């Protein structure tokens, strides 16, 4: 039984890591294909000798009409989701407070900076779509964590 449970956890961890990497790659792809070449990510790809391939891809999608929020806000939400998934996978069997503090760092900083931009306390342009994209991953994670906790609590009580 314990081996079956361990196998289930390992599959879940693998799924979380794969999904986190997919979110990260999708966010990077949006940046590389639809954003300015002056961004650091493009410069890093240039150093790796990937600029010709990326330029070819950029040319092939140049007529795609994607919305502003997909171009500018969605990648950051995908990065936030990737961070949460990968950190949760790394600390899967640990339910200490430090795990949740570490998972909360990126969402708190991103949401906080967006709110501070709105209040004009930090430099930058407030964008409600950024705020939404930063907020959705931690909200989903909180709902998932709460439901898992309640399910495990009910399961233990019924034994």
Task: Name each model feature, range by range.
Residues 1-159:
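Bulky hydrophobic segments
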């Amino acid at each position: 039984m314990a081996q079956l449970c361990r196998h289930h956890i390992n599959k879940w961890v693998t799924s979380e890591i794969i999904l986190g990497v997919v979110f990260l790659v999708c966010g990077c792809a949006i940046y590389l294909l639809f954003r300015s070449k002056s961004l650091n990510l493009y410069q890093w790809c240039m150093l790796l000798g990937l600029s010709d391939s990326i330029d070819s891809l950029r040319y092939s999608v140049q007529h795609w009409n994607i919305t502003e929020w997909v171009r500018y806000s969605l990648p950051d939400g995908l990065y936030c989701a990737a961070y949460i998934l990968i950190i949760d996978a790394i600390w899967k069997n640990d339910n200490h407070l430090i795990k949740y503090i570490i998972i909360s760092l990126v969402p708190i900083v991103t949401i906080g900076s967006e709110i501070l931009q709105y209040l004009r306390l930090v430099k930058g342009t407030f964008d409600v779509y950024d705020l939404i994209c930063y907020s959705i991953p931690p909200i989903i994670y909180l709902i998932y964590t709460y439901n898992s906790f309640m399910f495990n609590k009910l399961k233990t009580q019924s034994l």
